[in-house]
């Protein structure tokens, strides 16, 4: 019994190793820079060189000022969007996106209608026409 379990465990490990290695791409082993240059499809000299330039204090301050302006404009835009007070809903109606099973009253929004799905098990008030 223990021998069969050992064989099955070994087989399982072998299969896991085999499937992991079968999905990996084959590796190309390059021995020196000459073979790298001859085997590469992209010539490294085609790309422009990158130059790193140190920033002076003035350019750093301008960058900070621009970032602060962007932050303040975002804050002002979020403050300007104040939620308008909702009109109080009258009792004998159902709000939009709420459940409106057939014994329930009609939808409060005049453009909304009660739409049922799954054999009238899930019903909700939905606005169907945007031009209303």
Swiss-Prot record:
A Pfam short name: Agouti
Region annotated Disordered, chain positions: 61-87
Record-level GO cellular component terms: extracellular space
Annotated glycosylation sites: 39
Alphabetical list of PROSITE patterns matching this protein: AGOUTI_1, AGOUTI_2
Name of the protein in its database record: Agouti-signaling protein
Signal peptide range in chain numbering: 1-22
Keyword terms: Disulfide bond, Glycoprotein, Knottin, Secreted, Signal
GO biological process, one term: hormone-mediated signaling pathway
Gene this chain is encoded by: ASIP
General function of this protein: Involved in the regulation of melanogenesis. The binding of ASP to MC1R precludes alpha-MSH initiated signaling and thus blocks production of cAMP, leading to a down-regulation of eumelanogenesis (brown/black pigment) and thus increasing synthesis of pheomelanin (yellow/red pigment).
SUPFAM superfamilies with a match to the protein in the record: Agouti-related protein (SSF57055)
Record domain Agouti: where: 93-132
Species of origin: Gorilla gorilla gorilla (Western lowland gorilla)
Compartment list: Secreted
Ranges of compositional bias, category Basic and acidic residues: 63-79
Domain notes: The presence of a 'disulfide through disulfide knot' structurally defines this protein as a knottin.
Disulfide cysteine pairs (residue numbers): 93-108, 100-114, 107-125, 111-132, 116-123
An annotated Gene Ontology molecular function: melanocortin receptor binding
Gene3D superfamilies reported for this sequence: Agouti domain
